[in-house]
Structure formats: structure tokens, C-alpha cells
């Protein structure tokens, strides 16, 4: 018969019925504490001064380790990642499994922290964070929000260190700051998990990141080896044709006059439009020059405002339709050990795998 004390978090007292009536039974922790006290008394009697000094040093070392451990647990920058390569996605309760998997739980358990270090997965994770910032930020739990901003911090530091794709991160931070401004202004109307002061501090951090990226300067590398300008024209042209983003083509065209000439090629922009958009969409947004030629470059940016461009990623999460498991697929392990990336029971696992786009990842957890 538990007795609930004044502190609602207390487990209360435990009582047991005996022949003489109800008696309070002591918990195991109290018994252990009493035994420890007895041991400490006996130790103080037995130990001499030299042994006592050693014993005190051990106690001091233990207390120091405990403080560090508590600090690690309470540190707001500490990440709560499981570092798992796969998770089971269940959308309803069953006899075997209670509850369901939420977006925040999936975000916590999948190893996004290591994924941003892989250049093939970097853009994928950034796009996923951007979609969460636009529409799913309020659906994340407190732990998931902390992990979200810790991953974002790692991404910003990575961009500041290696200058990899800063424009993509600027777009992400712009969307995130806009969402936070709206949520903070409408506090009380929107479901914003956590203290409002924490969110204001996070917004200030985002503004500081934006300023750091704005001040980012590309240092000129002093290298006597082969540079991009030394390559033949047909190789430079081949590089430009590999790009799937129009802004990347424009940015590269600003490096040298030769690259600018190649970046203005009408055929290049035509191929880019055909890759991202359908022919029916061309007809609705035709832009002609004074001579009657189609302005493919202007059409690309016009179509981009009306239709979503085709997304292309080096590596993505995969979903197994047979096992209902979401996982990262390690291609090196798959080639060497025929590892599917998760414990799959299908006869032909590869036929059950589906690449998961960032939007599909969000949709998986809409119940």
C-alpha cells in the first residue's frame, strides 16, 4: 500500500500487513545505505593514517568522475543519439509492440550526426532539416529539438571549416529563422515545446551563424599544381553538364572568363530544363528573345518558381517494405559482405528497398 507524500515525484512509503497490523517496510536503497555507513565506520577504525590517505584519494577521484558524469548528462550541447543504422517504423499499437514511432524518435535514433560527415549524405540531411524547419519543428520533442540544433551546429562548423556548400546552409538558416520568428510572435497560440527564453536564445544563435556565414571568405589556395583553368575546354564543358543546380553553374562561371562563356551556353541550360521539368511545363512558361529564340536560362529560373526541381542526392535513407524498417545502407559493406543494412528476412532483400526522399521521410510519420 504506497503512501504518496507531499512531493508528487516521491515514490512514497511501502507498507506491509502483519499480524500486529500495518508496518512500514524499508526500501533496498535504505538498507544498502545503512550497510554502507557501517562499512565506513569499520573502515575508519581499521585503516591507519597511510591507508586512510589512499582511501580519501580514491573517494576524491570517484567524486570527481561522478561530477564529470553529471555535467556530461546535464550539458545542453550533449547529444542523445543512439547511433543506430536502422529503426522499425510502426504506426499503430499491436499485441507485440505498444505505441508508434514518431518523427522525433526517428530523428533521435538514426545516425544523422555521422551522416553529415559523409559528403554523399550531407545535402540529404540538410534538406531534411530544412523541411523540418518549415513545417515540423513544433512536432519534435524537447530531446529531438536539442539534437536538431546540435546537428545544425555541427553542419555550420563544418561549412565554416571546409567551405562546403554555404549557400545551401544559408537557405536552411533563413527558413529556420523565419519559422522561429513566427512561432515566437504567436507564443500561446502555437504549440511550442520548451521555455520561450530558450527559443529566443536559439534564434539569437541562428542570427550569429548567419552573420558568420555572411562574413565567410574563400581563401585563395597557393598551389603550383594543376588547376581548373588548365583543363581543356571539352573537359570543363563536361564538368558543367554534370551540375544539377543552376546557381552552381552561375557561381562557377564567375571564376574565369572561359568558364563564364561556357556557363552561358544555351544548350547547357536546355539540358538542365529538360532534366528538371516536363515539356508540358515548358509550354506554359515560354520565354522568347527578340530574335525568337527560347531563353533557356531565364526559363529555368521561371520554372523553378512554379514547380519543384528534381532532387538528386549521393546517398539517402532506404525503407524496406518487407520489414517496415528505415535504414542507412552502407554500400561498402553491401559489396564486401552482402550486408543489406538491417536484419532483413526477405528472400530477395534488394527488391524490397525503396530510396526515401526528405519529403517521404516526413510523410512516413504523418498519422
From Swiss-Prot:
GO terms for cellular component: cytoplasm; nucleus; SCF ubiquitin ligase complex; ubiquitin ligase complex. Residues 1-83 are annotated as: Interaction with beta-actin. Residues 226-274 form the F-box domain. InterPro entries: F-box-like_dom_sf (IPR036047), FBX25/32 (IPR040394). Coiled coil: none annotated. GO terms for molecular function: actin binding; ubiquitin-protein transferase activity. Its main location: nucleus. Keywords: Actin-binding, Chromosomal rearrangement, Nucleus, Ubl conjugation pathway. It comes from the Eukaryota. Transmembrane segments: none annotated. Substrate-recognition component of the SCF (SKP1-CUL1-F-box protein)-type E3 ubiquitin ligase complex. May play a role in accumulation of expanded polyglutamine (polyQ) protein huntingtin (HTT). Part of a SCF (SKP1-cullin-F-box) protein ligase complex consisting of FBXO25, SKP1, CUL1 and RBX1. Interacts directly with SKP1 and CUL1. Interacts (via C-terminus) with beta-actin (via N-terminus). This is F-box only protein 25.
